[in-house]
From Swiss-Prot:
It comes from Trichophyton rubrum (strain ATCC MYA-4607 / CBS 118892). Pleiotropic ABC efflux transporter involved in the modulation susceptibility to itraconazole. It holds the Pfam family ABC_membrane. Residues 81-370, 725-1012 form the ABC transmembrane type-1 domain. The lineage of its organism: Eukaryota, Fungi, Dikarya, Ascomycota, Pezizomycotina. Belongs to the ABC transporter superfamily. ABCB family. Multidrug resistance exporter (TC 3.A.1.201) subfamily. Keywords: ATP-binding, Cell membrane, Glycoprotein, Membrane, Nucleotide-binding, Transmembrane, Transmembrane helix, Transport. This is ABC multidrug transporter MDR5. Residues 663-680 have a biased composition (Basic and acidic residues).
Amino acid sequence: MTEEPKPVTPVLRDGEAGLDTTAPTEAGSLGEEAPKKEADGIVDVPDAEQQKQEAPQQGFSAYVKLWAWCEPIDVVLRICGFFAAVASGTALPLMTIIFGKFVNIFNDFGVGKISGDDFRAQISKNALWFVYLFIGKFALVYIHTICFNITAIRSVRKLRLQYIRAILRQEMAYFDTYTPGSVATRISNNANLIQTGMSEKVGTCCQGVAMLISAFVVAFTQSWRLTLPVATSIPTAVTLVGITVALDAKLEAKILDIYSKAGGLVEETLGSIRVVVAFGAGDRLSKKYDNHLEAAKGFGVKKGPVLGIQYSSEFFIMYCAYALAFWYGIKLLLQGKIGSGGDILTVLFSIVIGTSSLTMIAPTLGEFTKAGAAANDVLNMINRVPEIDSLSAEGLKPSSVKGDLELSNAVFSYPARPTIRVLDGVNLKIPARKVTALVGASGSGKSTIIGLLERWYDPASGSITLDGVDIKDLNVGWLRRQIGLVQQEPVLFNDTIYTNVLYGLPPDEIAQMDEEKKRELVRQACIESNADDFIQGFPKGYDTIVGERGSLLSGGQRQRVAIARSIISNPPILLLDEATSALDPTAEAIVQAALDKVSQSRTTVLIAHKLSTVKKADNIIVMNKGQVIEQGTHESLLDTKGQYWSLVNAQSLSLASDDSSSDTDKETDTQPAEILEKHATTKSTHSKVPHEVAAESEDVARKFSLFKCLLIIFYEQRRHWLFFLLGGIASVVSGGAFPAQAILFSRIVTTFQLPRDQWQEKGDFWALMFFVLALCILLTYASIGFFLTVAAFRSSKFYRSEYFKAMISQDIAYFDKPANSSGSLTARLSTDPQNLQDLLSSNIGLILIVIVSLLAVSLLALVTGWKLALVSLFGCLPPLFLAGFIRMRMEMQAQDKNAKLYLESARFASEAVNSIRTVSSLTLESTVYNNYGDRLKRPVARSLKYTAIAMIFFGFSDSVDTAAMALAFWYGGRLMSYGEYDAQQFFVIFIAVIFGGQAAGFIFGFTMNTTKAHAAANHIIHLRGQVAPINGSTGEEPASTEDSDVAVEFRNVSFSYPTRPDQPVLRKINLNIRHGQNVGLVGPSGCGKTTMIALLERFYDVTSGDILINGKPLTDIDVTKYRETASLVSQETTLYQGTIRENILLGVTRDVPDEEIHQACKDANIHDFIISLPEGYNTEAGSRGLSFSGGQRQRLATARALLRNPDFLFLDEATSALDTESERVVQAALEHAKRGRTTIAVAHRLSTVQDCDAIFVLEAGKIVEQGTHQELLRRKGRYFEMCKAQSLDREA
């Protein structure tokens, strides 16, 4: 049953082949084997077109629609499962007929109608029927559980795939308002809920319904007069349960939506953990996360009374039905309208079984409710029709492309800010096979034009044409495959360098190439982008893992790999959005030469703030406020002395030295790649694939036993002691209902052995006792539902919050591990507290009920008659417990292994969606889809194998009570026949043991809950108890500036990253920086500049040597207080969910007046832009702030840093994303901000450091030159060559 489902044939258009939605390629990683079929754009589900037009699904309607997601084999399995479940549900009602016969036999023997020999013979004969029922039920339960589990696994796999596919095909406007970071939460949590709701729970529900119906059929055949009034309890119970389930579904949907939004915040936070740590923003972001949790808790608490009513009404009606059946049955018997006492008991026990079936059905309805809420979310996404469908087969596909692009009167506003025109009637021509450069201020619309050319958005009015054809008429995927794009902030996937570069090739081309050809193309592209040398320097070369979003490479290395990816397919159009912004001058010159070469034969659109990269362009277009204000060549624009001339002058870099006759030796221009790139080798070479590393990092699972975990949890949640205590007391009292039932039923059975004139009196009394028991149950189950649900949600809120705080409190080295990617951690933060909550809610009360009842009925049986009790108990419970134990062990092992594998697939999906612009520009949607399917294969195959074996034990534990009945009747009958027991003793023991066996069976129905909760509790407890060596340390107050003349001192500092301790990044660094000095760090990409900033922020501790701050060792200073004295502006800025105001205030703990916020923004040249927005400072930043341009984000980050008024200012390419004018203004603001504080700036754009008090030139982890700008120029060494490469004069 493990074969892959065959896809339903999708609707095809224009002769295109369909995308295989269920049979991904066998490639082990993204891109190794591309999909061989083109996406058709039609969702692969029955009646997809109709579904697309429907309104959002709600509750059970969404759950019902899940069942359309199946293949023919799944339909067959479900039909088999349905009939097997129905047949197994009839077993117990059929048993009541045999039970009625037993009662008549026992009564006949009790009044002396039959002899002992006849009694034993009839008992033995009828006991065999119980054995037959056991065998039949065992087989049927196994069949229905395995059938429904297999189809659930297969269907949810398909849902996961289609959910990812649906997200990937959405237009960019959707992502401006939707939080892509929540994909890990949604895909993990929702898929788990849906699978639970479609697995054996469906069979259990069908079994319960069949049991209910067949029980009443049996009851009606015995006596319709008695059954009819009692049957009125069923619609009453169903109505109440239906109402409460509907209310529960609405609350559950709201809770899931809030958790999804919280998951987006978590992913943003973990994905930019360095910014969070540097700014001490953990507390502020934790409060925002807590606000989400508080809202979810509010709805969760409202579920308390709903579930309380649901549980209590169900059991109250059930016990009232028992009372009514016996009371009215006695009346009918005395009136001669029913045959015998055995008939009454057959009807009574049929009703007992029928109403008890509601206890089987009700828990499954809760799972169906959760599955329906999750399905609502999933199906709404799957059925959403994108405005620009990247997978659509519609549109023209010209056979050739010349490359003429034209924008005619293009007007555009971003959907998130429709009142702000980003482009205002732009008219421009981009001629084929020419280089056209776009320059201008940040926010002038340059990158927006790139987005329109990629057709991420459509203009509000006007048109964009390619070779005279409106791009709206072209096939979206075809259009994007004609374009190579390198973005300002390049995104690489957590895979090998080889695979990342290979993504630039169209999937159908990859499928037709052999491995040798693919590697040849990849290497050639890397040679052209100046990436081959540093790649070859890695131990694993092109098979080096680059980390999440390429984080294990330096910025320049990422950029060069991205350039190689863009040119490998030799596209006719090349879009370069700040393509060389992250490169050092030497690498920039070489890469620029390569870009000049590859641009000669194609249409190239170049966006740049660094004007040295555009002066050779055929046409330079100057933009301002969404309009074209100048255009021409570099020379002609300089001659006009207009806006462009001003921009060039602002970037001029003096090459004149005070003493040109210096005889300082000139440094060689050559740099051995294997030395130059050791930094990258250290950071990026991970020889283990993600799931193998994950296995190493998760060796703490189940460090504590479940009992100890619960003790820790209850101790920590002692403030909710009253809720847990009242829920626990209610559970204990409810557990006593089972032995009470045993006593009452035994009294009822033996009532018919009394004189006839006592029947009415005894019948009234015992019926009244059942009603009293029903009132007790009403109170106790209401208490369980209310108190434990409220306590669970309150506890869950605490552990979600604490888990998040524990994660963001870890050192940066923790996040460097591939197993701890933001996607994986977000998925864990979603599933682990949820699993713990599921146990702490009413489930723990039900488990306690089962334990109490099992102990109570066993004690009652032993006290009543130890011989029969021992035989019955040991004949029933040991095999039951053995089967349950084996099943639990298997579930624990499967849960451990699958959790890691599903985390890896969730990480992969999250990374792809968070990089949606890169995915869409490379038309990787189908590749991501297929490789995501590959990552699902292992957990799916493992689950199928586990299901086939584990369900044997499930079936046995679910049906062994029938075999125990056979043993109890046979042996009990023999004891009675020899006069050792009377009928009352026998029935007390028999019913007690049967109820005990059923209770023991119920406890193993919670094994998956307890297994998941056990693992979750250990994860949470372990991480919370894990003290981070750096972030968790305490120390002394930071030294004052008066304690030392030297602000920062490096003494023989050497460093290697924890993931590669054998690869040194910094080697014996020695430098002194005095108070108030402005220092620049320059050098080739990967030389260790950013690593020094990381050490100064104390993201890591040095391997050897010391860093002194104001004369005091950095390791002796309290890390939190030290970081409060520093601000960091990094190369890739990060904004978070929330308003602009909240983002600027990130990490600031004091109350800041608006005037101070406004001044910081004015200093960063962003205030005017902010107040031009309709909502001003209250404008929502959106997911990662992507609705703002790169320059706008950078200026907001600069304002955020300035607001802290730090002693130390660390600038890591702080102005790299700014246009010339903004750079000039921000640079002036930074110059102003530097006064009175120590500043260390990392820069490739040397114009930003030429006025520094000291410049340190790094190479291969060592300082090779130092001095002022003029001093270094006089040496005509490494720095001089770098300056020369960036010269902007006409002769350069």
